Structure formats: C-alpha cells, structure tokens
Amino acid sequence: MDEAPVTRSTLNVNSQQKSKAKNKIKNTLNSNELSSIEQRKKYQKHLKKHKNTAEDISGKGNCSPPWRLLSSVLGAMCLLLMAVAMVMTTFTTKSSSERSSSTIQQEGLHHPCPENWVWFRCSCYFFSKEELIWRDSQRACLSLNSSLIRMNKEEMNFFSLKSFFWVGVYYNETRRQWLWEDHSVLPSGLFSKLEANMKNFCASYKSKEAYMEENCANKLTYICKK
C-alpha cells in the first residue's frame, strides 16, 4: 500500500494539534497549582482565625490570669495584717498606760505621806506656808520628824518653785565651805554657783538654775523631807 504524501498543510495541522495538547496540559497544571495555592491560603486563614479566637478566650474570658489572682490575695493579706497591727498597737498603749497609772497608785499606797505632804521617789516633802529664819526652819522640820531638804540632782530637776525656800545648806566659816546641815560636804557640782566667804549665810532654792546665798536671819518658807 502506498504511503500518503506528506504535505505542508499536513505538517501545519500536526503542529497545531501538538500546540493545543501542550496548552491543555499547561492549563491543567496551572489550574492544579492555583487550586493548591487557594487551599493553602484557606488553611492559613483558618489557622489565623482559630488563633485569634483562642487569644480572645484567654484575654476576655471569665478566668483571670494566675498573677492577678495572686496579687489580689496578697493585697487582702496586707490589709488584714495592717488592721491587726493597728489593733495590737492600740491595745498595747492602753495596757501600758493602765499599768503605769496602777503602779503609781500602788506605790502611793505603799508609801503614804501625811496630810499636806507630797510624795516623790519614795520620799515625802512638806512645803511650808509660814516664813521662818533658817535655824527655826530646822527646828520646825525636826518637830515633824523630818529635816530641811537635802537635795540631789534628781530633785533639783523635779522641783521648780514659784518662790525661794530654805534648804538644808549653810556656809561654815571655820571650814570655809558650804555644807549640809549635818556638816557633811556637798557633792561636786551641786549648788556650785554659791559664793564663798559668806559669813552667816544659808542657801535658798527656787529651781535648779535659781538658788542663792541668803542671810540666815532672813525669814523664808522652807521644805522638809522624810
């Protein structure tokens, strides 16, 4: 059998058919690629939506993060401790005040002083209203089973009077120094401002910064101590 002659038109037809086949294959591949890309985009969009939903639930839900709950608990505990501390401080202050008052009352009962006498540091003091010379003041205190006050630094810090009173200090001309009424020497620094060489002089007292030499024949009020 004789083969049909190959003509240019036949070649063109074959070429067109091959070109169409290639385009069809190419379009098919492109379509598949597009479909795959679209699927990936849809999947990524789905993941993103799911992630946002999870964040909304964790951020806006009813369940608070643990650190918020912990801070609330700690804040409440701090307020409670402050309230307890305030109550304890008030109670301690009140108890201390009551104990101090009770102690003073008990000490006053244990160390009672006669009427018109003042109690201080386990001693009783009498502040006279009458004025006498120093020697007569001595005798008046002796009649009350006491003596003219022999002051110490604590008493000088405590007693601040409105006027001058006789105390148990006089100037001894023979020894040329100030002595207590029992002739003992004054402690160093006590009544240090009194001047020497004061014949027939005794000491009068008003406060720790106000005491002076006074002629023993002058009349003053006096302080007795026992």
UniProtKB/Swiss-Prot annotation:
Coiled-coil portions: none
**Residue ranges crossing the lipid bilayer per the database entry:** 69-89
A GO BP term here is: natural killer cell activation
Q: Which Gene3D superfamilies does this one have?
A: Mannose-Binding Protein A, subunit A (3.10.100.10)
Q: How does it assemble?
A: Heterodimer; with KLRI1 or KLRI2.
PANTHER family in UniProt: C-TYPE LECTIN PROTEINS (PTHR22800), KILLER CELL LECTIN-LIKE RECEPTOR SUBFAMILY E MEMBER 1 (PTHR22800:SF256)
Give me the Extracellular side stretches, as residue ranges. 90-226
Membrane topology qualifier: Single-pass type II membrane protein
The keyword DNA repair appears for this protein:
no
Glycosylation sites (chain numbering)? 145
- Summarize the record's disruption phenotype note: Viable and fertile, with no gross abnormalities. Development of natural killer (NK) cells appears to be normal. Cytolytic activity of activated NK cells against allogeneic target cells is significantly reduced.
What is the protein's known function?
Answer: Lectin-like receptor for natural killer (NK) cells. Can either inhibit or activate NK cell cytotoxic activity, depending on its binding partner. Heterodimer formation with KLRI1 mediates NK cell inhibition whereas heterodimer formation with KLRI2 mediates NK cell activation. Plays a role in allogeneic recognition by the immune system.
User: What tissues express this gene product?
Assistant: Expressed in natural killer (NK) cells (at protein level). Also detected in natural killer T (NKT) cells (at protein level). Has little or no expression in T cells (at protein level).
Q: Where is this region: Disordered?
A: 1-28
One protein family per Pfam: Lectin_C
Compositionally biased spans, kind Polar residues: 7-18
Keywords in alphabetical order: Cell membrane, Disulfide bond, Glycoprotein, Lectin, Membrane, Receptor, Signal-anchor, Transmembrane, Transmembrane helix
State the Gene Ontology terms under molecular function: carbohydrate binding; identical protein binding; protein phosphatase binding; transmembrane signaling receptor activity
Originating organism: Mus musculus
Query: What protein name applies here?
Result: Killer cell lectin-like receptor subfamily E member 1
Q: Which residues form each disulfide bond in the chain?
A: 113-124, 141-224, 202-216
Q: Where in the cell is it found?
A: Cell membrane
Residue numbers on the Cytoplasmic membrane side: 1-68
- What is one GO cellular-component annotation here? plasma membrane
Which positions fall inside the C-type lectin domain? Answer: 120-225
